[in-house]
């Protein structure tokens, strides 16, 4: 089954075209890496798939349903969380919020079955040891893994992640990338991941889609990540460099020394 299917999809935002005439599909269980410069339409596309944004024309299906009919199948991790860190929530409570939202509970007493699922989700992302620590006291990488656990508690079939590696140091990037790889291997969840820096994620990417308010390229990493394609979006300084059997993609937003990821040749 197609996890996501888009045909001639045009998304508007406040009357302006944000993304025009895009056609693509994602097979269930596969990972799509969504690449493009600022303002390319990446976040708008994610929000439209998640039914947070509804101004579009053309066809968009999520597991053969309209996006808003498939919301219970979708987990979403935004680039910036909306939690008020002045509220003293523990890591466990933040994760449990994902289960409370899905179950319809609105009171402050967290049901035991949701707490158990929250503990399991924290264990999955390697953070059992911080479950009782305040969320606001965690490092950036730990916070991101807690937010991943919060999205996983509802057992989604599709996980949408907006810049999950942004503003993280190299060590935290590696930790989050490892968790994403674990999700792919052990859960088989379809993922769509937006990124400015594609290199740390390429080992889990089945397809890459490059957009800049329209579809520039879509296909396997080695099909999309070519000098001519990257330069057409990022300019003459962008390039793809073969190093040790891998390809490093330099777009101007990243530096080669910041990470050890690459794209298979």
Task: Annotate each predicted stretch with a short phrase.
Residues 96, 111-130:
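Conserved ABC ATPase "signature" region
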Residues 134-138, 142:
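Conserved ABC ATPase signature
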Residues 50:
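Helix-to-loop junction immediately C-terminal to a conserved catalytic motif
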Residues 58-70:
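Conserved ABC transporter NBD signature motif
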Residues 155:
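Conserved catalytic motifs of ABC-family nucleotide-binding domains
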Residues 226-227, 233-265:
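ABC ATPase nucleotide-binding domains
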Residues 159-163:
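Catalytic Walker B motif of ABC-type/P-loop ATPase nucleotide-binding domains
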């Amino acid at each position: 089954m197609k996890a996501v299917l888009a045909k001639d999809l045009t998304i508007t935002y406040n009357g302006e075209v944000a993304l025009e005439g895009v056609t693509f599909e994602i097979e269930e269980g596969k990972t799509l890496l969504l690449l493009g410069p600022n303002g390319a339409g990446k976040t708008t596309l994610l929000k439209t798939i998640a039914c947070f944004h509804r101004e579009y024309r053309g066809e968009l299906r999520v597991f053969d349903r309209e996006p808003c009919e498939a919301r219970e199948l979708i987990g979403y991790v935004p680039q910036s969380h909306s939690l008020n860190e002045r509220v003293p929530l523990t890591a466990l409570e933040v994760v449990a919020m994902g289960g409370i939202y899905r179950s319809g509970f609105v009171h402050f007493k967290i049901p035991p079955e949701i707490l158990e699922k929250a503990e399991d989700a924290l264990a999955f992302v390697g953070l059992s040891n911080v479950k009782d620590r305040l969320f606001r006291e965690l490092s950036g990488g730990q916070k991101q893994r807690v937010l991943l656990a919060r999205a996983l508690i509802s057992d989604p079939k599709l996980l949408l992640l907006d810049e999950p590696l942004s503003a993280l140091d190299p060590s935290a990037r590696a930790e989050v990338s490892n968790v994403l790889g674990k999700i792919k291997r052990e859960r088989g969840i379809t993922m769509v991941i937006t990124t400015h820096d594609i290199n740390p994620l390429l080992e889990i990417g089945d397809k890459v889609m490059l957009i800049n308010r329209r579809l520039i390229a879509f296909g396997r990493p080695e099909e999309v990540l070519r000098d001519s394609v990257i330069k057409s979006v990022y300019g003459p300084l962008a390039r793809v460099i073969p190093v040790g059997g891998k390809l490093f993609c330099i777009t101007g937003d990243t530096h080669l020394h910041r990470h050890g990821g690459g794209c298979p040749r």
